[in-house]
Structure formats: structure tokens, C-alpha cells
Amino acid sequence: MERVAVTEAAVGTRFPLYADPEDGRWTTTGRGSWTGGFWTGLLWLRARYTEDWADRRTAAAWTARLAPWAEADTATRGLIFWYGTAPAGSDGRAAALRERAARACLAAYDPELGLLPWGGALGGPRLLARADGVPGTVPLLAGAGPRGAAAAAAHLHRHLDLCLGEDGRRGDGGRDRERDGGRDRERIGGSDRTRVGGRTGPPPARPHPAWSFDAATGWQPCEDPAPGWSRGRAWLLLAVADALLRPAVSGGAAARLDAAAGQLLAEAGVLGGRAVPPADSSRPDGPLDTSAAAITAVALLKLARVPGPRAAVCAARGEAVLRHLAGAHVTGRGPGRPAGMLLDGCYDAGKGLAVRHELVWGDFFLALGLAALVDGVDLTLV
């Protein structure tokens, strides 16, 4: 947590995004963008660790600054408001902000598309489905009552349909389909989803983490992020784990979600391969992404809390990945740069942007996972 204090002093009133591996200097944003919640989440984790009221006040003040994003048109509100407020525990203001964001997301849910659209707040096309628009959104929506839980389930399943391809449909888990003209209506946990347009041919050979929608042609795969984006798989695994921990979301589709988890674990050898994956699996000698590893480790620890035959191996692997990150990729004390930096995170391999840097969300998930190992946080609630 010393690194959090150093970062706080360095960024002033701005939100940290990524830090240079040579000197630890942060690139920052004024309003937080999609990563703002990870900074406030880190501050809440520090407050839990220190049990210092001054640290709680600091975390609360930064969290309040997320409020303008509550009604913003972006599915990344799941990342912003779940991870930015859930570590706050019983803090009433953080809970109220989370509930406000959940209601706004539910209002923005599109029942025709069966998801909360990616949105236009960050620029670019609005009608996208992206793997990073699912984590956080599932538990956030689930907190908005039965309608929210149904929307969370539909949002997740639509992304699994698209991002995992046909293999992602293994183990339908009680989903009923009925043809209604050119529309395919699916029931998930008592809620209807309608696939409008559908695919225009077979799914691509390699599942894509991002899709765009057009009323004339339906869902079409995007080339960016690339199909081998390891963080995309990590985000999906995290969302599936959160759904499996929430019966109101998993409902009768638990078998399908379990199959999706199995597919995601197998695709990149998560349980037995490299602890830190390449940022793009099609470039095995390219940049690593420790943030993908940290996200995956937390997802594994969550899956370990789901009763079943893989719980023990997920627990062991999640802990092993966290220990590897802490031992091999975190800076120690010495001249030139701060201690406690989780290096070798890759912001955007395709653009060559911040490819071996400290990333604020990598820091958050490493801290969250390590806190869970010492029972400092309940991963079924964060």
C-alpha cells in the first residue's frame, strides 16, 4: 500500500492511468475515464488495510468524483462503479452512488439487443458489444432488483454468444428458444432476449472480443481489439465468475455459465500455462500483460468459491499467479523508481501504447487478490 500513497502524492487531483516503467511517472486523466473506479477501489483497499479514518475520508472524496459518470452513456460504468465502490463495504455514500449507477444502467439496457450497449461516452460507435463491457456490469445490474438481475444475465449471455462463438453455447442450462419470424427469442432466468438481425454467416474461426451492430446486417466482428486479446478473455472469465456467485443472475443457466468458464480456462491454458499471458496470444513473443494475469487470478479465486470439482484447482492456481506477479513483476526498493510497481502491463499492444507499464487496474486486481488471500476482503461481495 506504500505505492498507493506515493501515487496519491504524485497525481494530485488527477486520476492515474499508467506509469512509466523507468521512473514511475504517471500518465493521468482529469475525470477518471473508464479506469477511475480502479483508483478509488485501491484507495478503499488501502483504508481497509490501514483502518485509518483519514484514508477512508480520502477514498470517499475520490469516489464522490466518479458521480458524473453515473448517467454517462457507457457500459464501462460496470468497471467504474462496481470496482470503485464495492471495496468501500458499508460506506453509505459509496453504496448510494453504486445504486444510482445501477439504476441508470438498467434504464439504458436495450431489450431488443439484449444488452447494455457499449455507448458513445468514450467516443466511437455506440452499438458495440465488447468483452470489457461485461465485468462489473453483471454485479452492478444485479443490485438493481429482479429486473436488474435479469438484465445482467441477458447482458452476459449476449456477450458470451458473440465473444465465445458457437462453443460458448455449450451447456444451454435451461435456455429455451423459439423462432418468431426472423427473430430468435431466448428466455434466460425468466426474461426475454431478442436477437435482432443475427449473424450473417458462421461465426469466425477465432472468437472476437468486440462486435458492432447494424440493423441491416446484424452483429459483425470488429478487428480491434484483436481476437487474441488476453485481457478480453480475462474480463469475460471475471464476469462469468461473478454471475456464478449470484443465483439471481445464473438462474437456470448455471450449466451454460460453467461450460463458458471451462472454455475460457482451456483456451489460454489458464490452469497450467504461463502465469502471465502475452497481451495478444497470436504474438506469443510480444509484450506480456500482467494486468490480464491479475484479473484472471481474481476470477480464479472467485471460481474457487463456486462449489464444484474445479474449486480447489482454481484456488491453487489463483494464489500461484498472484505470488508470481508479486515476486517477479513488482519493483523492489532501489534508485530511479518507486517500489511496489506492477510492471509489464500492456495498455494497447496493437497501437504500441504503454506496453510494459504499470497499469492502475493491474495494481487494483493484484491488491484485491492479495487482500483476499489474507481474508482482508470477501470476493463474493467485491
Where are each of the predicted segments found?
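Glycan-recognition and catalytic cores of secretory/periplasmic carbohydrate-active enzymes
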Residues: 1-382
